[in-house]
Amino acid sequence: MKYLCLVYSDEELLHSLPESPRDEECLAYAESVQESGRLIAGEALAPVQTATTVRVRTGKTTVTDGPFAETKEQLAGFYMVEARDLNEALRIAEGIPPARV
């Protein structure tokens, strides 16, 4: 079964902590999940400052800069994995480095 693990983080907090996961650690973890045959896809997303929100209401498209809502945490990336069941997917998700922050 496929599971989508969403990675949320507070960008300011993540980059201010001396022990926060760095790109190398995240890439190494993604590589280990890929080598296990469980990774279908995974990507880090661009910083929230580059976000654009697109909405369509009653046939009219509205485009605004930035995320739709002010939040403390932002969607920072994702892992799509193949797992036997939810428990295996949870074990994979708990190993994602930013999950510790």
Regions found by a protein language model. Name each.
Residues 1-101:
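Conserved, structured core segments of small domains
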